[in-house]
Amino acid sequence: MWLIGAFISATFLGFYDVFKKKALINNAVLPILFLNTFFSSLIFLPFIILSSHTHCLDNSFFYVEQGGWYEHQYIILKSVIVLSSWIFGYISMKHLPLTMVGPINATRPIMVLVGAMCVYGEHLNMYQWIGVVLALLSLFLLSISGKKEGIHFTHNKWIFFLFIAAVLGAISGLYDKFLMASPANGGVGLNKMLVQSWFNIYQCLWMGLILALLWLPTRHK
């Protein structure tokens, strides 16, 4: 059952990348990213309002717990990490072929595995090590094929941006574990819906500020 869910998730992520690429063609990155965060926040806004003003979501999966500054400071940091990853990722996707972006983005789980070893002291099994080796091999082969298309991994700034996005995405995954783990296990113990809902809201606010300061004043130049 979980394997089927993983394949469905991978399929939707594939469509997501294709639609992102199409949206970025002949469009500026910042307004597209703002609209992405805006519509994402609209999805979770009703859950926040219903949870705080009614009892209809009490004891349900969609209930958003009330949080103070202690909880929200961690969520704000998560929004900064994720949004930074998205900005670098969107910029690189606009300038690179999707056949190059997809495989490099697929190395993020490998980065998370390595990060889990370094940060949380976890151990990889044989199959996970095989996955790490295959991911590194695929990057090497991508660098070779990229040269044939005129894309040099060591001299292309868009590739550099893409790797920054992947690293920040992996950091976000490791940070999620810290946020969700109970205090007894060294984490913060935040509610999943609290994090998911409010981090989308904060992302939208950050992007609104970035759009107003960086894009709107120069959009006609």
Residue ranges and their predicted role:
Residues 1-20, 25-30, 34-96, 144-163, ...:
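Membrane-interface interhelical linkers
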Residues 1-11, 110-173, 177, 181:
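Juxtamembrane helix-loop boundary signature in multi-pass membrane transporters
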